[in-house]
A protein has these predicted regions:
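Beta-propeller fold detector
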Residues: 1, 35-101, 141-153
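Beta-rich, blade/repeat-based domains predominating
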Residues: 2-12, 95-116, 150-169
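Hydrophobic/aromatic beta-strand positions that recur at structurally equivalent sites within the blades
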Residues: 9, 32-37, 112, 123, ...
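Conserved beta-propeller blade signature
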Residues: 12, 16-20, 119-123, 131, ...
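Residue-level signature of beta-propeller blades and closely related beta-rich strand-turn architectures
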Residues: 23-24, 37, 126, 176-178
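C-terminal or late-domain output modules
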Residues: 129-157, 161-178
Length: 178
């Protein structure tokens, strides 16, 4: 399998959803922010264009119902300026705030959680690392943060992030597959 593969989701206190796509094709994982309310009127038509259930069957799955987000210029990145003008934006669904790559190639993003400050932690399964990204615009705030403990610490050895949570005191906890 190659390409984007949705792996983990998180929902913030405002109801916005975040989706981490693993990417098995030796490229960095991509995190997408989907707004629960409002949107970004990128085409300037005065309407927030978004994917919708046109067939009224309770599922958005037909090609005509899903507004695409695709690498139309072939540079391997979903391009979209953060502010107007949105010329060349490859995100057509205007409830999608942003899509950003996180970490290096072959990271395989398999862990994502929201911290007490509202920002996201994304774990790289293949690399044993976490990156902290902004919930506002997706830029990297911190990282890489290794899962390999300092020598002499309990459970010495690297972790393969598969799930995570941040407790009330702001401590990042990770779960490994093995």
């Amino acid at each position: 399998f190659a390409g984007p593969a949705p792996s983990r989701t998180a929902v913030d206190t405002n109801g916005n959803a975040y989706v981490a796509n693993r990417w098995f094709a030796n490229v960095p994982p991509v995190v997408v922010k989907i707004l629960t309310e409002g949107g970004i009127d990128r085409n300037g038509n005065g309407v927030i264009n978004t994917s919708s259930d046109l067939s009224n069957d309770g599922v958005i799955n037909d090609a005509g119902e899903i507004l695409p987000m695709a690498d139309t210029n072939g540079n391997g990145i979903i391009d979209c300026p953060q502010s107007a003008p949105f010329t060349g934006c490859e995100i057509q669904d205007e409830r999608i705030a942003w899509a950003v790559r996180v970490g290096p190639n072959n990271g395989l993003g398999r862990s994502m959680c929201i911290g007490t400050d509202g920002h996201l932690w994304v774990g790289m399964y293949n690399l044993g690392q976490y990156f902290k990204i902004s919930s506002v615009d997706g830029h990297t705030i911190a990282g890489p943060v290794s899962t390999t403990p300092t020598a002499g610490q309990p459970n010495a050895g690297g972790g393969t992030p598969y799930g995570c949570l941040v407790d009330g005191s702001g401590t990042l906890w990770g779960a490994n597959l093995s």
